[in-house]
């Protein structure tokens, strides 16, 4: 069933949804318009769904630097144009050349990977009219969804989950393989990225790698990392716990334009109550789903350093 976001934006739907979350009497004729028959869940009201996304972005950075697209209809495919746009000077009165670009599109099939989360809450809180259940659920779901999303957008295999930027086959291009992470290797990575993508380039690494880079100096003793702005070569650094350490065979640093990583939302966040599962604990469970996919649509837009594998 395709969810009509105009319905989930209505105040009456919002009231009935939160009545359902509190196990109160609801108007099924209103609530059923937001029901996903495949999961038995109800789409969150638009305002609450936005709060979930805000909670994700508060804790995790990948959605901030990627391109987020809504594609709620079934059967969607996206097309990424991999060619550079072409312009030519044309003499007065001369024919304008027709540029055939149909073959320059790479077709990227977008799946609907299901991300699930369960949040539990004591019945006393649920029945307390003064307890802000919307704030609690949106923040909890934002944190759990955000953590799973970020890990998948970086390390995902593409099978039953998004394709991460570190995926060997469909992720970012490997710019170089280095025995160790030194000043020259970082400079080589920077200039391996085409100027088109370098202009909006961002560094991605974990805390341990950042600590190593903070200590790197050039031949004149100048630090690679600018502590005043927390930048490397003038470009922002983002830290993620899901980037690997500097170790054999790993890809500890990614650099490039992350807007070419597309996060495609296939269905809005939806929730249903689990009344019986936790009854012995005087709790109510909330099962939530998010359907989405993620892919790097231009492999050359982001490059990585790979640490050479040690021979045993």
Set out the residue ranges of the language-model regions.
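Assembly-associated, polar helix/coil segments characteristic of icosahedral protein shells
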Residues: 1-108
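Alpha-helical scaffold segments that mediate packing/assembly in large oligomeric complexes
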Residues: 98-191, 304-312
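A residue-level signal for conserved active-site and pocket-lining positions in enzyme catalytic cores
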Residues: 78, 141, 286
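Short loop/turn segments at secondary-structure transitions that flank enzyme active sites
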Residues: 82-87, 116, 125, 147, ...
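Extended oligomerization regions of viral-like shell subunits
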Residues: 157-293, 301-312
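Short helix/loop capping segments that flank catalytic or ligand/cofactor-binding pockets
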Residues: 80, 86-90, 98, 128-130, ...
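Short, solvent-exposed loop/turn segments at the edges of secondary structure
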Residues: 73, 112-114, 281
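Alpha-helix initiation and N-capping motif
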Residues: 14, 49, 59, 75, ...
